[in-house]
């Protein structure tokens, strides 16, 4: 049964006398939807960036929808996605489904202002960057300084994106800071909670 987890669902589209089969992610991409699920790493970031650039080339005036269900991951991979979101012309709407933790929360907050959303029972978590450090004392010092630099960068960007004072944000990020969708709305991480009308 393990092989079942590796299957990607397909969608059959009927057009006239023809049928076309799409994997579900390609079909969503036609609707300008990108789905970022799981750990954020370099290969996943490359895929998301390619999709963002492709959708911009298709229509630079229509919003792109980035659905997030992620426990977080690599800071550098997340920053690459963030930079691309800010670089392209279309607004990127971010929608949390399930969870947006750590770098996932950072990307959720990076959506276009007024277009950052969450489903009702999603959870959002922010915290400071962390990393395992080993090696010689000089290497440990270099790595520690880099983690502190990245922490300051993340706080600066998030503070600007969500309008929370840097000192408060730094204090809240000292430990895992979990929020419901309602908490995230009050905090400024999202702009709307999506409910069925």
Curated annotation (Swiss-Prot):
Gene Ontology terms, MF aspect: ATP-dependent peptidase activity; ATPase binding; serine-type endopeptidase activity
Compartments in which it is found: Cytoplasm
Reactions it catalyzes: Hydrolysis of proteins to small peptides in the presence of ATP and magnesium. alpha-casein is the usual test substrate. In the absence of ATP, only oligopeptides shorter than five residues are hydrolyzed (such as succinyl-Leu-Tyr-|-NHMec, and Leu-Tyr-Leu-|-Tyr-Trp, in which cleavage of the -Tyr-|-Leu- and -Tyr-|-Trp bonds also occurs)
Gene Ontology cellular component list: cytoplasm; endopeptidase Clp complex
Keywords: Cytoplasm, Hydrolase, Protease, Serine protease
Matches recorded under InterPro entries: ClpP, ClpP/crotonase-like_dom_sf, ClpP/TepA, ClpP_Ser_AS
GO annotation (BP), single: protein quality control for misfolded or incompletely synthesized proteins
Domain of life assignment: Bacteria
EC code: 3.4.21.92
Keyword Zinc on entry: no
Recorded family membership: Belongs to the peptidase S14 family.
Self-association state and partner proteins as the record states: Fourteen ClpP subunits assemble into 2 heptameric rings which stack back to back to give a disk-like structure with a central cavity, resembling the structure of eukaryotic proteasomes.
Annotated protein name in UniProt: ATP-dependent Clp protease proteolytic subunit
Annotated organism of origin: Borreliella afzelii (strain PKo) (Borrelia afzelii)
Gene name as annotated: clpP
């Amino acid at each position: 049964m393990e092989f079942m987890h590796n299957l990607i669902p397909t969608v059959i589209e009927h057009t006239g006398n023809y049928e076309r089969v799409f994997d579900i992610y390609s079909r969503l991409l036609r609707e300008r939807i990108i789905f970022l699920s799981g750990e954020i790493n370099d290969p996943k970031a490359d895929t998301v960036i390619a999709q963002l650039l492709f959708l911009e080339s298709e229509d630079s005036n229509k919003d792109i929808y980035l659905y997030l269900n992620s426990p977080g991951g690599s800071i550098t991979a997340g920053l690459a996605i963030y930079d691309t979101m800010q670089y392209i012309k279309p607004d990127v709407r971010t929608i949390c489904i399930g969870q947006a933790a750590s770098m996932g929360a950072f990307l959720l907050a990076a959506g276009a202002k007024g277009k950052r959303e969450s489903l009702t029972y999603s959870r959002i978590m922010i915290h400071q960057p962390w990393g395992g450090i080993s090696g010689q004392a000089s290497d440990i010092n270099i790595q520690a300084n880099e983690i502190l630099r990245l922490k300051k960068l993340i706080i600066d960007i998030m503070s600007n994106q969500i309008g929370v004072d840097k000192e408060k944000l730094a204090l809240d990020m000292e430990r895992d800071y979990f929020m419901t969708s309602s908490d995230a709305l009050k905090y400024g991480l999202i702009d709307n909670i999506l409910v069925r009308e």
